[in-house]
Amino acid sequence: MPKQKTHRGAAKRFKKTGSGKLKRSHAYTSHLFANKSTKAKRKLRKAGVVSAGDFKRIRQMLDNLK
């Protein structure tokens, strides 16, 4: 049986917090900022947390990540 490998694409996009949750960055932050309000841009800066529905699937991809 081969070793289970960490999904490298997911490893670059998610980080584990101290409590075991997964941090993620928001979408819509690479360009077209002139159309967005200051408030919208400010809210996009803060990292989000992976929702409960997606957590199980992403955790399987990051199984070996410390």
From Swiss-Prot:
Keyword annotations from UniProtKB, A to Z: Ribonucleoprotein, Ribosomal protein
GO terms under cellular component:
cytosolic large ribosomal subunit
Q: Which GO terms describe its biological process?
A: translation
Q: Which Gene3D superfamilies match?
A: 4.10.410.60
Domain of life, per UniProt, equals Bacteria
Q: Where is this region: Disordered?
A: 1-26
> What family name appears in the similarity comment?
Belongs to the bacterial ribosomal protein bL35 family.
What's the name of the protein? Large ribosomal subunit protein bL35
State the organism named in the record: Bacillus cereus (strain ATCC 14579 / DSM 31 / CCUG 7414 / JCM 2152 / NBRC 15305 / NCIMB 9373 / NCTC 2599 / NRRL B-3711)
Q: What lineage does UniProt assign to this protein's organism?
A: Bacteria, Bacillati, Bacillota, Bacilli, Bacillales
